[in-house]
Amino acid sequence: MPFTPLHFGPHALVGLSFEKRLDLPVFLGANIAVDLEPLMVMSLGLPYPLHGIFHTFPVGGLAGLVFATLCFPFRGHLNRLMKYLRLPYATSYTKMAVSGILGAWLHILFDSVMYYDITPFYPFQANPLLGLLS
């Protein structure tokens, strides 16, 4: 489900645990960006799977990379935000890119365990992660 609060807590925990290696705002933002796809499907009533191509590791990773690239020019604003939150922040394009990809992938991993309509290893149609934790 788009923007589920169940994603934010675990992703924030991972992001904060690796704050020196990850760009926290990009990591968390990429995790949310992946759910723009189901939001559009529901909002516009599109005849498309709720969890479609963006919920695959290849395309989701690419979406995370694009998100990081779009955030790169705004790193000064992100720096001010992190200072306001009293969180350390030092970034680079590489750090942002890796954070975007990993943020998207973690989101897909979480959803793959719960939702039957996800094919995380596209083009393979199976989801071996479905029900893994049940």
Predicted regions and their residues:
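N-terminal membrane-targeting hydrophobic helices
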Residues: 1-134
